[in-house]
A protein has these predicted regions:
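Structural signature of Gram-negative outer-membrane beta-barrels, strongest in the C-terminal barrel
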Residues: 44-46, 67-193, 245, 282
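Residues that define the transmembrane beta-barrel architecture of outer-membrane proteins
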Residues: 23-27, 70-76, 106-108, 164-168, ...
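C-terminal beta-signal and adjacent terminal beta-strands/loops
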Residues: 195, 297-315, 342-397
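Transmembrane beta-strands of outer-membrane beta-barrel pores
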Residues: 1-5, 53-59, 86-88, 95-101, ...
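Repeated loop/turn-to-beta-strand initiation elements of outer-membrane beta-barrel proteins
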Residues: 39-47, 88-91, 121-124, 178-183, ...
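Face-selective signature of the C-terminal outer-membrane beta-barrel domain
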Residues: 1-104, 182-191, 225-227, 239-245
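Gram-negative outer-membrane beta-barrel transporters
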Residues: 85, 90, 184-185, 189-193, ...
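Membrane-embedded beta-barrel scaffold of Gram-negative outer-membrane proteins
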Residues: 1-10, 117, 125, 159-216, ...
């Protein structure tokens, strides 16, 4: 059970009527059965079945924007799957059925997974799975972005259909010991096709002059790429984990993202970089001392930057803004973090740990944030905080 009672303010130009209140209650109940059988068809197997019921009641009020939205979502679902265990193969097949009160027909979602493991140090996997996203209001739809001193509201289109996904992936996983070092390498390729993908399109203004965007079904999208993960460890002394992904996220046809007819549509899915990766290095060279260094690389991406309505901006305003909507190709970022820990043993039962470090050491942060009361508050990308120093104390028993 989860309950949210949130007071909010989504206003611009110190709008006194932009306060709101959201109440959201979600509860889930379900059960599962697992049975092991000596033989099902051709090999020993594990059978799993389960049922689940979800209920979500949402009431969002923002009187200043004339919004009073009530949404009740009820989902009844069930799944069955069987896992066959053979000498070198493990085959898993199953499906899930969901009945959603906002969708006319039940959603059938099958999946298949085949694992090949000839030795303890090597395995290969093939997976096919399906899924959906229901045509309902999500948490991001409740937030009101401010552009040009006015609010931007999101509404659902009439007849909005569910978004469906069809995913394929294949991977190989290799593990080896080289002297006193333990190594692991994972190479994965993936492809996901999205049909009736959700897109946002600007449709005009409401009676209060706020911009209204409508969540509609687009033509479709494709997300595909390769991922490489590696691990290297030498006991407690040092451990390194790295990963890098090359990905393409594209709409199947050009989609409009701005109502300005002079702005070109795009096939790029917004805020999805083509390259991203990470690394984590931990070391404990001494008995009471350990450290960690980690980094996240975020490649360039396309982010919409919306221009304000200049007819409402006073002359000689202290901030300047772009003249028309732009699809910005952002720079890439490398966010490096460092943390040091030292533990003092006070007695047999109590330990005192002092820690300190820095987050975003290189201060990789967006340089072109809009400013002032007419800014595009949704124009934000990259690391969420600039260079930050921290210290901490932890007592354990």
């Amino acid at each position: 059970v989860q309950h949210t009672d949130r007071n909010s303010y989504y206003g611009a130009q110190q709008n006194p009527d932009a306060y709101g209140k959201t109440k959201d209650l979600t509860w889930v109940v379900g059960g599962m059965y697992v049975g092991n059988f000596e033989k099902v068809l051709f090999s020993p197997a594990t059978f799993t079945a389960g049922m689940e019921y979800q209920n979500n009641s949402l009431h969002d009020i923002m009187l200043g924007y004339h919004r009073d939205m009530k949404q009740d979502v009820r989902i009844a679902g069930g799944f069955v799957q069987n896992e066959w265990k053979m000498n070198r193969f493990i085959l898993l097949a199953g499906f899930r059925v969901d009945s959603h009160n906002l969708i006319d027909n039940p959603i059938f979602s099958p999946r298949v997974n085949l694992l090949y493991k000839p030795t303890d140090k090597f395995q290969a996997r093939l997976t096919w799975s399906t899924g959906f996203r229901a045509p309902q209001a999500y948490d991001e739809d409740l937030h009101v972005t401010a552009v040009g001193g006015e609010g931007v509201l999101i509404k659902l289109a009439d007849g909005l259909k569910p978004e469906h996904s069809n995913s394929f992936s294949g991977s190989v996983d290799w593990t080896a010991n080289i002297g006193h070092w333990q190594t692991n390498l994972l190479l994965e390729a993936f492809y996901t096709g999205l049909d009736d993908v959700f897109v946002l399109e600007k449709i005009g203004q409401d009676e209060q002059g706020n911009t209204v965007k409508e969540r509609r079904n687009g033509n479709g999208a494709r997300v595909y790429g390769v991922n490489l993960d590696g691990k290297l460890a030498h006991g407690r002394d040092v451990a390194l984990q790295v990963g890098f992904t090359v990905q393409r996220s594209r709409y199947t046809k050009y989609e409009n993202w701005s109502e300005d007819e002079n702005v070109e549509p795009t096939k790029f899915m917004p805020r999805t970089p083509d390259y991203y990766g990470y690394f984590t290095l931990t070391s404990a060279p001494f008995k009471n001392f350990d450290m960690s260094v980690s980094g996240v690389y975020t490649g360039r991406m396309h982010v919409p930057h919306l221009a304000p309505d200049f007819s409402v901006i006073p002359e000689n305003y202290e901030y300047s803004y772009i003249r028309k909507d732009e699809l910005v190709h952002t720079p890439d970022f490398f966010d490096l973090n460092l943390k040091l820990n030292y533990t003092f043993v006070l007695n047999d039962h109590i330990k005192l740990q002092l820690n300190g470090g820095v987050q975003n050491l290189f201060n990789a942060f967006q340089k072109d944030l809009d400013k002032g009361g007419f800014r595009d508050s949704g124009y934000f990308y990259g690391p969420t905080q600039p260079r930050t120093y921290f210290i901490g104390v932890k007592i354990t028993n």
